[in-house]
């Protein structure tokens, strides 16, 4: 078993690795951007290189990111669904650039209909995302939820 924590990327994504080392972490989770916004500023190529270098030097693994809390792959609202899929592809792009094992995501909240229908929407959205990025090594990591109404996972 490896123990890690979610670390801030304030000052650059590579700083999260340094913070993890200070706290004795063996694994790491980060947000690659503000988790309460749809889009983030592009990752600095120099920071990407430094992050990858620091991960390799420290042996911290696995390193993962957590997707924006705004993403809802279970929604039946077309505009929100499209925005969620686009945002999730962006999350995967960022994680792939950083060499992360995966992106942790809350699958979504059922906004209408049966939970089974919402689960199909989630699966369909993940298929769309993988079709958009078929060669990526970064995995989608579904985070379970408990006792949060119609939140699925």
Enumerate the language-model features and the residues they cover.
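Active-site acidic/histidine proton-transfer and metal-coordination neighborhood
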Residues: 73-153
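N-terminal pre-domain/capping segments
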Residues: 1-67, 71, 75-90
């Amino acid at each position: 078993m490896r123990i890690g924590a979610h670390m801030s990327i304030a000052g650059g994504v590579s700083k999260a690795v340094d913070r993890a080392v200070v706290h004795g972490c063996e694994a790491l989770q980060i947000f690659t951007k503000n988790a309460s916004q749809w889009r983030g500023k592009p990752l600095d190529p120099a920071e990407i290189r430094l992050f990858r270098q620091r991960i390799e030097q420290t042996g911290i693994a696995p390193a993962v990111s957590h997707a924006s809390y705004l993403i809802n792959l279970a929604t039946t609202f077309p505009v929100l669904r499209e925005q969620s899929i686009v945002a999730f592809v962006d999350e995967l792009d960022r994680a792939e650039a950083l060499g992360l094992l995966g992106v942790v995501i809350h699958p979504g909240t059922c906004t209408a209909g049966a939970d089974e229908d919402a689960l199909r929407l989630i699966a369909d959205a993940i298929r769309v995302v993988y079709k958009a990025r078929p060669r990526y090594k970064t995995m989608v990591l579904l985070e379970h939820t408990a006792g949060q109404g119609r939140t699925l996972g």
